[in-house]
Amino acid sequence: MIPFFKKKIYLTRAIEDNLNFQKYFNLLQPNLEAKEIFVSVPLLNICFDNIENLFIPENNLIFTSRHGIKAFSESRYLNLKKIFCVGKSTAEIAIQFGFKNVCFPDEGNVKSLIKLISKEKKNLQTFHYLRGEKVSFNLRKALSDLGYKTNETVIYKQESNN
């Protein structure tokens, strides 16, 4: 227990995130035991859709989360696509899963991603946004408003743990 805390702290992210948080906490605070301080209680499960037969003709793919990367990682066409990731950590996961042509903005947010994409030649580029069912920003609309043809496919769902 943290000396000034009398109760445990609940971590509500996905199990993988909670375990990583506890691992990094132990690195920063080696004298404290994360398992004694934190309780992992995920509120959501990530459920990947079956995309085995999904064919995406576009050469430019957009990912705004590591879950999208993981869901699409079984694709046979990884080396043939240019991958736009929302930030460095998503890009690193893409590279770990075998994507070769990966780019990401300096700042890991959707507005910076849009700026990066907007450097591409508009009239020659078509994009495909692979995403979760629930998103906080309509990236397809934002890119369409800038003149980009953007298709999207939901490849995972965030389901409640009720």
Across the structure, where does each feature detected by a protein language model lie?
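Signature of uroporphyrinogen-III synthase
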Residues: 1-162
